[in-house]
Regions:
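Carbohydrate-recognition beta-sandwich/jelly-roll modules
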Residues: 28, 136-139, 190-499, 620, ...
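Extracellular and organelle-lumenal recognition/adhesion modules and their flexible linkers in secreted
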Residues: 26-196
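Asparagine-centered strand-capping/turn motif at beta-strand->loop junctions
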Residues: 171, 279, 781-784
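Active-site-proximal substrate-binding groove within the catalytic cores of carbohydrate-active enzymes
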Residues: 206-215, 342-345, 363-413, 429-435, ...
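Bacterial N-terminal signal peptides
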Residues: 8-16
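Active-site-adjacent "subsite" loops/lids of carbohydrate-active enzymes
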Residues: 491-566, 658
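Positively charged n-region of N-terminal signal peptides that target proteins for export
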Residues: 1-4
Length: 791
């Protein structure tokens, strides 16, 4: 183990003597400078260390987004650089030239900073061979205000695509800082580059410097590679190989061992790898990617459970790029991702076993790449993170979905309708039977006449739409009449939005489901003590919105038990719909009265829905969908509607109908070339999926768009959703509603409660597709001519 003690020089990274000095030390030498600030760095690996002090004040570029608000000075006596920024946006201080670098080099910025106000970050701008920026904030680390000087470190590993770097400091908002004793270090890592393990199915090699993994499937010769991306200031320097595993150790910017990573063969499946990531639970942590992103190749496509599911070809520059969290209905609704070859069907699936604090990131790096990014638990590492990656030789996206279905069954997430019926007794089973094939109809009944909902529903039934889920709250008598008509009666409910009662006289409406008694004591609290913001409500004066705040999930079950029990004693609902519960992200709460991690949030939301489904035997629905609630939730409104590609303001203009079709609807939302029924392949026999109430079957007046939604309903064997404004709207569109419903009704009824066992693209252009169900039902849809057929 090599140890270097550095007594940092009294030379600022910004204000130097006007020349470039290179002092090189190898082995166990001590490099000392005349200053009182001492920091010990331990790098326990075979390396050369090169300390670089350089550049006078005129060698630095100072930039601010707001002009004339960045002030600086230099004290030559104690060699302190002073900076003050008097604006709310950002500023930077960087060297005015890029530095040429080579693969395998490691660069470290170390500085001593007094920060009484604002924030300062050290990072590197990273450039490729064409001087394009790869990353504006490579290896970024950030300081928060504190009394006295703090150490700030930033470290990067130079990967193959990085050809130049530019060290810099950046800040945001009103900031005051004193910066001294800054050193730039170049470290040449001489560690062994590769470690490998092998069994009868797979050969696995890990680049121990970049932690990128190459897997060769020995059954078909397929090679799977990962990107070598920057590791956010972490160096992996030690590796050991056992019979079935590779163990890696990394060191942080102070040279302390912090991360233990492991890649090993799964004990039950030779074609599977287990990845694990360990740190001290209280280690300050933002995010970290392990393993690195997997690269797609020619003829591959990415498989992502964005709501029902999507695929993006390996070279699709318009694929979704960015992060999709695994703890929100507007991320990945099931915690996995995969890549498969559309010709051979070979590929892999990666299952995130700790989804509460994780995201999956997709980016273009010559081809589309995808991998996990582990998030902190309230700013700390918290607990070990695990992922399982399984390789297969055929089956494509169906094999990916079925491998996850097997995992969901093993961990208790997959609970079928038949199992739910057994748990809920005769009355609960009868209610679930009403859900099968039921059109989900929303109506706020605004025709101004003295008609009641049962009048409208009777007309819908008489027209031929014979199974209905109705979720608009009505009085006791109307609910009884609807029940007598065989309708599955439900009502909208929400346990997220709470409006400050002081604003009731300012907003355009007061929602019956707000909980004024929860304000302010039971509201979710941010780290800075502010309340978590929720739905914005229009002001009476039309001058914008006033936000609700979010109820802390831990407190929600208490309010739900009181409310639901009281209401059911008066109204015999058969169902209940919980808005936002499985759409909004799991939350952290920093209240001392009800602190909450995202794991606590998940457990509380599960309990909330179980009050309805298990305690009261009601058919239970929620918005968009996350699969951890499948055991206690029976339908999702929005699972069919791909979240990133809905029309603008789909959550607000729910009762409007549109002539113009936005481009994202055609290119993504209803594009059969990009959609996959992943949710149905996993959970068709457990839950019913609907379109979103602002993205329903009749959202657009264009009949071709309506037809296409009907086609997807038939192919996936899921019932439609309609918005009906009033009786006049029903009568003027009755034939179209009935045609739409009947285009899939027989299919959805026959397939109800069955497993979807297969989905195929029957033509290379993916316009003809086929699904098959466990009872033998086969559905074929030709999207090019809007033709539906089934056996």
């Amino acid at each position: 183990m090599k140890k270097i003690v550095i007594i940092f020089c009294c030379i600022s990274l910004f204000i130097f003597s006007g020349c470039v000095n290179l002092q090189k030390s190898t082995t166990n030498g001590e490099v000392s400078f005349n200053d009182s600030f001492t920091e010990e760095l331990t790098f326990p690996f075979n390396a050369d260390y090169q300390q670089i002090d350089f550049f006078s004040p005129d060698k630095w570029d100072l930039w601010s987004r707001t002009e004339n608000k960045l002030f600086h000075d230099f004290s030559s006596e104690d060699e302190i650089f002073f900076v003050e920024y008097k604006a709310l946006d950002d500023f930077s201080i960087s060297i005015n030239n890029e530095m040429n670098v080579s693969e395998g080099e490691i660069y470290l910025i170390a500085s001593n900073i007094f920060l009484p106000k604002g924030n300062i970050s050290a990072n590197f701008i990273l450039y490729d061979e064409n001087d394009n920026v790869i990353d504006w904030v490579g290896g970024i680390t950030t300081l928060s205000p504190a009394n006295g000087y703090q150490s700030l470190y930033c470290l990067i590993y130079v990967t193959s695509e990085i050809k130049k770097i530019r060290p810099r400091f950046i800040g945001e908002g009103n900031t005051i800082a004193k910066i001294k004793n800054t050193v730039l270090y170049k470290i040449e890592n001489k560690q062994k580059k590769n470690s490998c393990i092998e069994n009868d199915f797979l050969k696995v090699c890990c680049d121990t410097q970049t932690i990128s993994v190459t897997v060769t499937d020995k059954r078909n010769g397929q090679v799977y590679e990962q990107c070598s991306e920057n590791l956010k200031g972490i160096i992996f320097t030690e590796s050991s190989v056992l019979e079935n595993e590779i163990q890696l150790t990394s060191y942080d910017k102070k040279g302390k061992p912090i991360i233990k990573s492991m890649i090993k063969f799964n004990s039950e499946n030779q074609a599977s790898l287990d990845y694990s990531l360990s740190m001290p639970p209280d280690y300050t942590f933002d995010s970290f990617s392990f393993p690195q992103k997997s690269m797609s190749k020619e003829n591959d496509y990415l498989v992502l459970p964005i709501n029902e599911g999507m695929c993006f070809d390996y070279n699709d520059e318009h694929a979704f790029h960015g992060e999709l969290v695994t703890y929100s209905g507007h991320g990945l609704c099931m915690p996995f991702y995969g890549i498969t070859n559309q010709i051979t069907g070979a590929g892999f699936v990666s299952i995130i076993k700790n989804p509460d604090d994780c995201a999956v990131e997709i980016k273009m790096n010559k081809t589309n790449c995808v991998g996990p990014n582990w998030k902190s638990q309230k700013g700390k590492f918290g607990y070990d993170r695990n992922m399982i990656q399984t390789f297969f030789t055929d089956g494509g996206h169906v094999a990916i979905a079925k491998e996850y279905r097997k995992y969901a069954k093993e961990n208790g997430t997959l609970v079928t309708f038949e199992e739910k019926k057994q748990k809920r007794g005769i009355e609960g089973a009868e209610r679930l039977n009403k859900l099968m094939g039921a059109a989900n109809i929303w109506c706020w009944y605004s025709d101004g006449k003295n008609h009641t909902a049962d009048t409208l529903v009777s007309q819908i039934l008489e027209a031929g739409i014979d199974r209905i889920l109705w979720s608009n709250n009505q009085n006791k008598e109307v609910i009884s009449k609807l029940n007598d008509l065989g309708v599955l009666t439900s009502r909208y409910d929400i346990y997220q939005d709470v409006m400050n009662p002081a604003y009731y006289n300012l907003v355009s409406y007061i929602h019956e489901d707000w909980l004024p008694q929860a304000y302010p004591n039971d509201i979710a609290t941010n780290k800075d003590g502010s309340f978590v913001q929720a739905w914005g409500v229009e002001r009476k004066d039309n001058k914008g919105y006033i936000n609700c705040v979010a109820l802390c999930d831990i407190t929600a079950p208490y309010y739900a038990r009181q409310k639901i029990q009281t209401e059911l004693s008066m109204k015999n609902f058969g169902s209940r719909f919980f808005d936002t519960t499985t759409a909004s992200s799991l939350r952290e709460c920093y209240s001392s009265a009800h602190p909450m991690t995202r794991t606590d949030s998940r457990k509380s939301r599960f309990e909330l829905l179980s009050i309805s489904s298990l305690e009261h035997k009601l058919v239970t629905g929620s918005e968009t969908g996350m699969d951890f609630v499948v055991p206690v939730c029976d339908y999702f409104e929005g699972m069919m509607s791909l979240g990133p590609y809905r029309r603008e303001d789909a959550g607000r203009d729910v009762d409007k109908f549109f002539d113009n079709v936005p481009s994202q609807i055609l290119e993504y939302q209803l594009n059969e070339k990009r959609r996959l029924p992943l949710w149905e392949l996993v959970y068709h026999d457990c839950c019913v999926a609907y379109w979103y109430w602002g993205d329903h079957n009749n959202t657009f007046n264009d009949q071709l768009i309506w037809d296409k939604r009907d086609n997807f309903n038939a192919l996936y064997a899921v019932p439609p959703m309609y918005w009906i404004k009033n009786e006049e709207h029903l009568q003027s569109n009755k034939e179209r509603f009935v045609k739409s419903y009947k285009s899939s009704a027989e299919i959805t009824k026959k397939a109800a409660g069955t497993e979807m066992i297969s989905h195929k693209f029957l033509t290379p252009d993916r316009t003809i597709q086929q699904t098959q169900f466990s009872n033998g039902l086969t559905v074929t849809v030709d999207f090019s001519i809007n033709q539906i057929s089934f056996n």
